Amino acid sequence: MSTPLPPRLPDSDSPPQQFVPPQSQPSADVLPFPQAAADAPSVSASPSADVLPGVTSPQALPDTAARRPFNLPGHFPFRLPATHSGRVALALCVVYLVWGSTYMAVHLSLESFPPLMLSGLRNLFAGIGLFIFAARRDPVWPTFAEVRNAAAVGTLLVGLSSGMLAFGMRTVETGTAAVMVATVPLFATVIAAIAGRKVAKGEWIAVGLGLVGIALLNHGDPSSGSTAGSLAILCGAVFWAGGSFLAGRLKLPSDLLVSTALQISLGGAMATIVAWVSGERIVSMGFTPFLAYLYLMLVGSMAAYVAYAYLIRHTSPIIASSCMYVNPVVAVVIGALFLGEVITKWTVMATLIILASVGLSFWFDYKRRGLV
């Protein structure tokens, strides 16, 4: 989406897979981009493993930190914290605040950008920037098949998912949209069941609880906007879950940053082409929408993905996945403070129910994988 989108999505009984960071905790970017299982070295999944469900052990991943993921070109005055705890705190602040604020940035950008064009252009140029950044690290270059697979996955995760989110947010408030995006893991459970994985009763309870929360959010809360907008956002969540499921079965580039850059840029390119063919045009450009667009591209897509990559590699699953619960709350608060959105009792109730259902879904997924 414009998200994202966090931890392992409950999609299959396949061996642990790599995840490349991005749009996913739930933000307007939603969840990180998953890597193909074929690319992941085999590891033992023990309860003490300091990795996300579905993520290879930090030792098995490319040494992203050693390849200077945070080094900035030139003599940029910003200095990163010297300690590990300081860098983790900084990465958490970036992921929490940036991905939680991208919903407001999308809202402001839509004053000048058509929805699909916004999704396409921001991700196209963000992906190109990440690709240039990755190229400076002398990465392992992908094969043609890996590029093709990255394009297919990126089209679902970025083109369709982010485009539908932006389309829905024309009529749905930012906080409501963020809470609805948090349902991605629930849709991932349904897709996994359709694909043949045995789903525990508790996981179905989580899905049902999430649907109750969605119903409360849309039928009890006047801020939920139009039905068409809400359906568009939910479709975006389905596309993201489907793209993540597909990514777990395709061979993607082994280098994390290269894979992320390709998925973002190629998905953005597809969205831009579709937007142009469908007649979307930028008629006029306001100063505020343009600044919001730059924020989405440079901070929401590029900086936040690098920060999430650091969390995946250097923290526990609980810490790394905490953005799944913090981002919707941040989005609701920012919408109320800066956009005048009303926080009703229905918003609070629906948010608590949906986040509880997501937590239940993750708990059963961790349990199934032997991580709890």
Please provide the spans of the model-predicted regions.
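Juxtamembrane helix-entry segments on the extracytoplasmic side of multipass membrane proteins
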Residues: T83-A89, E111-G120, P142-R148, W204, ...
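Small-residue-rich packing faces within the transmembrane alpha-helices of Major Facilitator Superfamily
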Residues: G100, L124-I128, L211, S265-A269, ...
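Transmembrane alpha-helical core positions of polytopic small-molecule transporters
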Residues: Y96-G100, V153-S162, V184-P185, I214, ...
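C-terminal-most transmembrane helix of multi-pass membrane proteins
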Residues: S2-P15, P32-P34, V43, P53-G54, ...
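Hydrophobic transmembrane alpha-helices of multi-pass small-molecule transport proteins
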Residues: L130, V153, T183, V199-H219, ...
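Transmembrane alpha-helical segments that form core, pore/gating elements
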Residues: L116, L130, F187-T189, I194, ...
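Helix-helix packing/entry segments at the starts of transmembrane helices
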Residues: S119-L121, S162, A177-T183, L246-A269, ...
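Specific transmembrane alpha-helical segments of multi-pass solute transporters/efflux pumps
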Residues: V98, T102-Y103, F131-A177, V181, ...
